[in-house]
Regions:
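Positively charged n-region of N-terminal signal peptides that target proteins for export
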Residues: 1-4
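Intrinsically disordered and other compositionally biased segments
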Residues: 6-7, 21
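Bacterial N-terminal signal peptides
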Residues: 7-16
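A residue-level marker of the well-folded mature domains of exported/periplasmic proteins
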Residues: 13, 21-330
Length: 330
């Protein structure tokens, strides 16, 4: 039987008007295109709001491009199109960091600045930015799921893709924390790269629940994973027996969360990520120095490691916080 996880207000600052450094407007107008993993899903729809709204605020012609499938080849084609259009800045949320290296190099050779998100140390990018600390992200998810599982039993791990660095780093951190602190817990099989698809996640969860009758938990780093897993668990009426934690879009997950088919998780706010794309691009185009200790817009004070801009702005997806995010359109 599940153990209840105490609600945590960590990250509630996302709902308040915290005093962040006011981003400077673009000194000269420029054009920016942001290529996301896949278009038409809630997470990236909300990110698009942040991109377009911040663009208008800072005087930047900023827009989002969403491939029809989460296929790296489609991202390559979208980036090639932006190069042909001679945009000033290209932003990317990569599906496969390695596959994008050649086309990002071509962009830089054409004089285009390149910014990525969720791809730390991305080769051929000027900057990558992160809104969540990797070790904390993994540890927080595992602490909560371990509490739910009674610190013992079998669990499975979903990620958005086996080739996206960040979600796999989160998974690595969670698994390492489990091995160090919860020896009676055991991960079944290897991680599954299904969490960008509700259908694939639901099918995989069903397969796992059939194969492992005593499965007690599913963790997912990828916004569609908890939804698919939660639906599978709800349909099997295992809400009270199986714990699901991970990154999900509040509007998609709130009903499953209230029913106990999803139990919680942590996310960054994709609207903030969209805003930060434009804020970092504007700082670069204005010639501002990006270094540890400075503040950049909604990131607040940053740390820099190589070409990665680091911050930590999580929100806990308990019922209370998730409802608030739904109210603001996420």
């Amino acid at each position: 039987m599940k153990k209840l996880v105490l609600p945590c207000l960590m990250g509630a600052a996302l709902f308040s008007n915290m005093a962040m450094a006011e981003s400077q407007k673009a000194q000269k107008p420029f054009t920016m295109g942001v290529v996301v993993k896949v278009g038409g899903i809630p997470w990236f729809n909300v990110m698009e709001q942040g991109i377009t709204e911040e663009g208008k605020k800072l005087g930047v012609n900023a827009f989002q491009v969403g491939p029809t499938t989460a296929d790296p080849a489609e991202q390559v084609r979208a980036i090639e199109d932006l190069i042909a259009k001679k945009v000033d800045v290209i932003g990317v949320v990569p599906n496969d960091a390695k596959v994008l290296e050649p086309v990002l190099k071509r962009a830089q050779e054409a004089g285009i600045k390149v910014i990525t998100h969720e791809s730390p140390d991305q080769k051929n990018a000027d900057w990558d930015f992160e809104l969540l600390d990797t070790q904390s992200m993994g540890a927080n998810h595992m602490k909560d799921m371990a509490a739910c599982m009674g610190e013992e039993g079998k669990y499975a791990m979903f990620v958005g893709s086996l080739t996206v660095p960040l979600v796999n780093e989160w998974a690595d951190a969670a698994i390492a924390y489990q091995k160090a602190h919860y020896p009676k817990m055991q991960m079944v099989d290897d991680r599954f790269g299904v969490a960008e698809s509700v259908d694939d996640s639901m099918r995989t969860a069903n397969d796992l629940l059939s194969k492992h009758k005593d499965l007690k938990g599913i963790m997912s780093f990828g916004s569609q994973g908890p939804i698919g897993a939660g639906r599978a668990i709800d349909k099997r009426r295992k809400n009270a027996e199986t714990c699901v934690f991970g990154t999900f879009t509040p509007g998609q997950g709130i009903k499953l969360l209230e029913k106990g088919a999803i139990d919680g998780g942590y996310i960054s706010n994709p609207k903030v990520a969209g805003q930060v794309f434009v804020q970092v691009a504007t700082a670069m185009m204005n010639g501002e120095e990006i270094k540890t200790g400075v503040s950049i817009g909604d990131m607040g004070e940053i740390k820099v490691s190589g070409n990665t801009i680091l911050s930590d702005n999580p929100v806990n997806l308990n019922v209370e916080n998730t409802k608030k995010l739904v109210e603001v359109g996420l």
